[in-house]
Amino acid sequence: AAPRLSNLMEDGKAQKTVQEIDKLLIQAKNFYENTSKYEGRGRLPGQDKFDIQVGSYSDTTEVYEDLRNFMTFNNDTIGSKWVSVFGNHDGSIFQDDEILPDLDNEGNIQCNNCPETRDAGMVEWYNLFNQSILESPYQDGHFIYVVIPGSGSGAEVVAPRIIIADAENPHYFHKIMDL
């Protein structure tokens, strides 16, 4: 009976993590629609602007390739390319998202026409969930994400794409949303 109960508990955790990822995606979509309405162009939580990536990926193919091998939370090589949804309070390997300054130290433009209302990704996520944090049901779990930047304008516009995963096993626990 013990192995069967253990399997049942693991199935429950898997279902719970997928439900939590779904909640994150719904809020990301709402955020995108609201920023589209109020800022003139939709962006996702943590994006300074629609055409700026979050994390270390610029295209989806690279993410897919890494997800094939990203099976544990402690994969430093791949994990360091991802951003924590609600921030790293334990100093883990995932990045914390920060606001990109309009100008770099040498006065070069980094974020042209970025919205004044933007904030760090973890703050934007935190506000989307009424100052609550969604926690992974897994001991080593942690919600992480990346945003592939949008591009173009007018009829040639390509919306950003978000990928959210549970660091317990991103290979199995991830979802991708096109907007």
Model-derived features: positions:
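Arginine residue identity/basic-tract feature
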Residues: R4, K29, R41-R43, R68, ...
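Intrinsically disordered, low-complexity regions enriched in Pro/Ser/Thr/Gly and acidic residues
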Residues: Y64-L179
